Amino acid sequence: MKFIDEARIEVIAGDGGDGSASMRREKFVPFGGPDGGDGGRGGNVYAIADRNINTLIDYRYAKKHLARNGENGRGSDCYGKGGDDVTLRMPVGTVVTDMDTGELIADLTEHGQQVMLAQGGAGGLGNLHFKSSTNRAPRQKTDGKPGERRMLRLELKVLADVGLLGMPNAGKSTFISSVSNAKPKIADYPFTTLAPNLGVVRVGPSKSFVIADIPGLIEGAAEGAGLGHQFLRHLQRTGVLLHLVDLAPFDENVDPVAEAKAIVGELRKYDEALYEKPRWLVLNKLDMVPEDEREARVADFLARFEWDGPVFEISALTGQGCEALCYAIYDYLAEHSDAHRAAEEEDLATDVRFRDAPPADGGATPGGDA
């Protein structure tokens, strides 16, 4: 299935039904009085997170989603039926934003989480509500309110604890396949990875974390070079970034330091907050460097790169150094997970408008119009 991580849709909630202006007309009941019922409420549009869906491809082609209108009220105190709701199933990790106002509507981070996207209009009042001691036969009634109409932007940001950064062919896919059960495509040409891959790394019976591999970046990605830098959105939820560097490039004219600096520059162009995220340097392909040259090459790289953060030397192909790196990652995440989760919850509390969402009366398949 084609991986789609962005879509734009229009959601239209149902209009409320009009109230009825009716009088009771019945044999042997003179002056029966008003009996016009209220209109039904318009249907709502909900989004629900579903872990069985992993792409937004359904919403790339079905762009308009409508809930049903409420029925009009009728005589004999008959109230109109409420419009059926529409439920849109989306992948866990989907962020929903109002394109007109920029408001963050929802951040679907848990399976089954349900959020209202558009609220149906209230039904109008029938004339029985306007009866009084001075107006025994009112003919007033109110019309139903229109439902909300919104243009929404959907963005899928995968849920991972660790993100991999690096140039094409830096060994990211080889690394994730060596430490997890993920089976990404691996080849000796650039841009083998075309979509994010997730792998679960287990360091104990009940100790694990999720790692995300995204397509490689090159210098100028912010201007559209290579595959661009839009895949960096999938690293925004991570707790730590691993910057993989090919320490033994096949082309002798390639400078690993220049490539590493280019990656950092692209990261900063995309998002300052992502640039400030904890980042570890992972020097890969040490098995390709002669043992007597390794220490000098590593020292030269660190000096020219001007790096004073955590450094790990590994070979993703042979597994050298990978186990120690995974244990260090788990220990770091365990130590900082509470603070990371608290920060995310604080952001949601201030930026996301969650509305109470009762169980939907009706639903629609992903991408289906009501």
UniProtKB/Swiss-Prot annotation:
Q: Which UniProt keywords apply?
A: Cytoplasm, GTP-binding, Hydrolase, Magnesium, Metal-binding, Nucleotide-binding
Its GO biological process annotations read: ribosome biogenesis
Subcellular location(s) per record: Cytoplasm
Entry's EC annotation: 3.6.5.-
Q: Which cofactor does it need?
A: Mg(2+)
Task: Name all OBG-type G domain ranges.
Answer: 160-334
In this chain, GTP is annotated as bound at 166-173, 191-195, 213-216, 284-287, 315-317
Occurrences of domain Obg (ranges): 1-159
The entry marks the following residues as binding Mg(2+), namely: S173, T193
Which intervals of the chain are annotated as region Disordered? 344-370
The record's GO CC annotations read: cytoplasm
Q: One GO MF term, please?
A: GTP binding
Q: Name one Pfam family in it.
A: GTP1_OBG
> What does the function comment of this entry state?
An essential GTPase which binds GTP, GDP and possibly (p)ppGpp with moderate affinity, with high nucleotide exchange rates and a fairly low GTP hydrolysis rate. Plays a role in control of the cell cycle, stress response, ribosome biogenesis and in those bacteria that undergo differentiation, in morphogenesis control.
Q: What HAMAP family does the record point to?
A: GTPase_Obg
Q: Which family is it part of?
A: Belongs to the TRAFAC class OBG-HflX-like GTPase superfamily. OBG GTPase family.
Q: What is this protein called?
A: GTPase Obg
Q: Which gene encodes it?
A: obg
